[in-house]
């Protein structure tokens, strides 16, 4: 260094057998800047690239692009002053037959003293706590700006799931959020349940855009073909939102949460679902150590 990583391209298998089919959650991506001992980036490979159920999906956005067939691309700018170390830990049960990558970077004479470093952290609650907001990011101390959210949602209850407000608590705000949204589908740029109507049924429409998207919906395990059971799954939804044009700045600390609120025929109600997420942000070092990543079995989708 000094330098900036401008582009990362990765492709790999998504399963090694019918029984070992969550490669994208078993591979753990980590990034270290300037000799630090604790990673600034730690997430399952698929989730980092907004593919959170062990299955790739088409994404055409400004920061993350996923194209056929399983071409994982990041255009997130990643500066470093001395050196950058990127590792991939294989926690999968088997060797991965195919894994290819390319990292494109430039070296510079210097980077400004105020340069902030890229961070990303993964979390999951396999069953959210009733009446308690799901935490997307917490313990972020220092100055920086928040640039994005990815959420993988497996709904475990009936009816509409997306009324929970996304909240940002900035620089000491605790009792009330500094920024409070109007619902999860609104935060990801949609409205009115993403709905269209076909044959008397309401269908959610998926989409992918430069700054926000709902690229993945499925009720089926597309990775498994078994003659003795069907492929039904709890409904799975993947969303991303990039704060490129609307970054969320903080000087001291940041916390990001989302309510667990749905609505049915009798009105609003508190939900319990299976949520996992990746938070993406820049900050000056040092950063707080992330919570320990769960064992691979506890990362697998339902």
Where does each model-flagged region fall?
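Beta-strand-centric surfaces of beta-sandwich/beta-rich domains
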Residues: 1-302
């Amino acid at each position: 260094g000094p330098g900036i990583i401008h582009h990362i391209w990765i492709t790999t298998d998504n399963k090694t057998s019918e029984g070992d089919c969550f490669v994208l959650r078993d591979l753990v991506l980590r990034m270290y800047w300037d000799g630090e001992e604790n990673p600034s980036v730690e997430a399952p490979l698929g989730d980092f690239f907004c593919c959170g159920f062990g299955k790739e999906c088409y994404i055409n956005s400004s920061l993350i692009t996923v194209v056929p067939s399983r071409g994982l691309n990041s255009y997130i700018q990643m500066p470093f002053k001395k050196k950058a170390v990127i590792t991939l830990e294989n926690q999968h049960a088997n060797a991965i037959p195919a894994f290819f990558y390319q990292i494109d970077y430039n070296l510079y004479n210097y980077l400004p003293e105020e340069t902030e470093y890229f961070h990303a952290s993964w979390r999951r609650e396999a069953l959210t706590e009733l009446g308690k907001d799901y935490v997307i990011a917490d313990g972020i101390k220092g100055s920086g700006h928040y640039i994005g959210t990815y959420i993988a949602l497996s709904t475990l209850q009936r009816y509409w799931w997306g009324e929970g407000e996304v909240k940002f608590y900035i620089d000491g705000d605790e009792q009330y959020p500094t920024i409070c949204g109007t619902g999860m589908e609104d935060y990801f740029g949609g409205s009115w349940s993403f709905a269209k109507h076909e044959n008397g049924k309401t269908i959610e429409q998926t989409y992918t855009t430069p700054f926000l998207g709902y690229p993945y919906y499925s009720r089926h395990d597309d990775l498994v073909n078994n003659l003795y059971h069907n492929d039904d799954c709890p409904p799975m939804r993947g969303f991303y939102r990039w704060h490129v044009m609307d970054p969320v700045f903080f000087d001291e600390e940041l916390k990001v949460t989302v309510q667990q609120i749905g609505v049915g025929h009798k009105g609003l109600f508190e939900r319990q679902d299976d949520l996992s997420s990746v938070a993406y942000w820049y900050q000056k070092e040092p950063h707080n150590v992330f919570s320990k990543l769960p064992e691979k079995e506890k990362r697998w989708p339902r």
